[in-house]
UniProtKB/Swiss-Prot annotation:
Coiled-coil regions listed in the entry: none
SMART domains: RuBisCO_small (SM00961)
Pfam families attached to this UniProt entry: AAA, RuBisCO_activase_AAA_helical, RuBisCO_small
Protein name, UniProt field: Ribulose bisphosphate carboxylase/oxygenase activase
Binding of ATP, residues: G37, R38, K39, G40, E41, G42, K43, T44
Organism: Nostoc sp. (strain PCC 7120 / SAG 25.82 / UTEX 2576)
Example of a GO MF term: ATP hydrolysis activity
Extent of Polar residues compositional bias: 311-326
Species classification: Bacteria, Bacillati, Cyanobacteriota, Cyanophyceae, Nostocales
Keyword field contains Nucleotide-binding: yes
Xref: InterPro entries: ATPase_AAA_core, P-loop_NTPase, RCA-like, RuBisCO_activase_AAA_helical, RuBisCO_ssu_dom, RuBisCO_ssu_sf
Family: Belongs to the RuBisCO activase family.
Keyword terms: ATP-binding, Nucleotide-binding
Gene label: rca
CDD domains: RuBisCO_small_like
Function: Activation of RuBisCO (ribulose-1,5-bisohosphate carboxylase/oxygenase; EC 4.1.1.39) involves the ATP-dependent carboxylation of the epsilon-amino group of lysine leading to a carbamate structure.
Length: 414
């Protein structure tokens, strides 16, 4: 099967890799090429095709390997794989690269709900150090005075803004945003269905029917066409015997005839796949289970009217109700923070964890409306009665905290 390589993707990758192996006087070449873009657009697969075309050997690291129960292991892994790749260049006498897939998933910080660990810091710092000193990469606990070969690093991800900003500066990382245009999509989808007898015009019609879908949608669509034959095969063998027939059988592997790859059938199946996508997008069940996502405007139905609470002659109830009444001073602080263009979040901690500073989010993050802030704080005071509750003002541009004010203490004072 002959797959399509987008010319501008191939050019970008080839230039970056080749430039790192050339000695150009007076030119500082970024060691890292960061390829980012929407999910499912074939960033990794296009890299694999380019490597194969150029005859380049690749050392792979997954974003999932960038975390470990032991502090320092991921940073050591990066250094070890880098040195191994440098040795490959020396021994094989050919271009080799180090590739890290989904870097943002392993070393990025998405929101306050994402844990920032020692390994996250060390991974960012290690990549920065390697980018600054690509021929002097040492393993912890040892030192080699001999310089090693320079190894280009290719990283992929969806959102590099979640990474440590100094890592992605231009001197260390060259960025390439991959968003295939219509011609690229037609070429790539044509490669996916190359053996299925679709004409160029039918490929274009298929792409134009689903213009907002990523590349992996069409790959999944081709796989789905075989579902009917596989279902019939399962029914023929029997659910009880299918495991033995497929995994542990002396019979020849099952063969399937070429299914119907007509344009009409592909569009029909594509609409079914699209329908499942929309069900996921519209369900938003995470709002019901994850406190961090509440109040972000994801509701699929209007919220119910608040019930009328009748007065109850109960001292504990009166005490809790009184705790939710915000003082004029607190309301004025909220207005001042928001008027400066900052956003607000609220955090809580019990008395035991207060000493260690282990604050946790009350729920909604980055509030920018006064009414939302007041209602969220009132709810937080009710939910965490008897704990410390504080208000945090955040500068969205600098992504830093500008105000931290304790609103409630365990003794009940606001």
């Amino acid at each position: 099967m002959s797959y399509y390589i987008a010319p501008r993707f191939l050019d970008k990758l080839a230039v970056h890799i080749t430039k790192n192996f050339l000695n150009i006087p007076g030119v500082r070449v970024p060691l890292i090429l960061g390829i980012h873009g929407r999910k499912g657009e074939g960033k990794t697969f296009q890299c694999e095709l380019a490597f194969e075309k150029m005859g380049i050997e690749v050392t792979l690291i997954s974003g999932g390997e960038l975390e470990s129960p032991d502090a320092g292991d991921p940073a050591r892994l990066i250094r070890l794989r880098y040195r191994e790749t440098a040795e490959l260049i020396k021994v094989r006498g050919k271009m080799c690269v180090l590739m890290i897939n989904d870097l943002d998933a392993g070393a990025g910080r998405f929101d306050e709900g994402t844990q920032y660990t020692v390994n996250t810091q060390l991974v960012n710092a290690t990549l920065m150090n390697i980018a600054d000193n690509p021929t002097d990469v040492q393993l912890p606990g040892s030192y080699d005075s001999n310089p090693i070969r320079r190894v280009p690093i290719i990283v992929t991800g969806n959102d590099f803004s979640t990474l440590y900003a100094p890592l992605i500066r231009d001197g260390r990382m060259e960025k390439f945003y991959w968003e295939p245009n219509r011609d690229d999509k037609v070429g790539i989808v044509g490669g996916i269905f190359a053996e299925d007898g679709l004409s160029q015009r039918e490929i274009e019609q298929l792409v134009d029917t689903f213009p907002k879908q990523s590349i992996d949608f069409f790959s999944a669509l081709r796989s789905r066409i075989y579902d009917i034959q596989i279902r019939d095969f399962i029914h023929k063998v029997g659910f009880e015997r299918i495991s033995l027939r497929v995994v542990n059988s002396l019979e020849a592997p099952p063969e399937f005839k070429k299914p119907d790859f007509s344009l009409a059938h592909l569009i029909e199946s594509g609409n079914l796949v699209l329908g499942e996508q929309q069900r996921v997008d519209n369900s938003q069940l995470v709002d019901e289970y994850n406190r961090l996502n509440r109040g972000r405007g994801y509701q699929t139905a209007p919220p119910p009217e608040a019930p009328v609470i009748q007065p109850v002659n109960n001292s504990s109830h009166k005490q809790k109700t009184s705790n939710t009444h915000l003082s004029l001073e607190t309301q004025e602080q909220i207005r001042q923070i928001l008027s400066q263009g900052h956003k607000i979040t609220f955090e809580h901690v019990d008395a035991r964890r207060f000493r260690t500073g282990s604050w946790q989010s009350c729920g909604t993050l980055h509030i920018d409306a006064e009414s939302d802030a007041i209602s969220t704080l009132e709810a937080c005071l009710v939910d965490y009665d008897g704990e410390y509750v504080r208000m945090v003002g955040i500068d969205p541009k600098g992504k830093r905290r500008v105000v931290e004010t304790i609103i409630q203490r365990p003794n009940g004072k606001n």
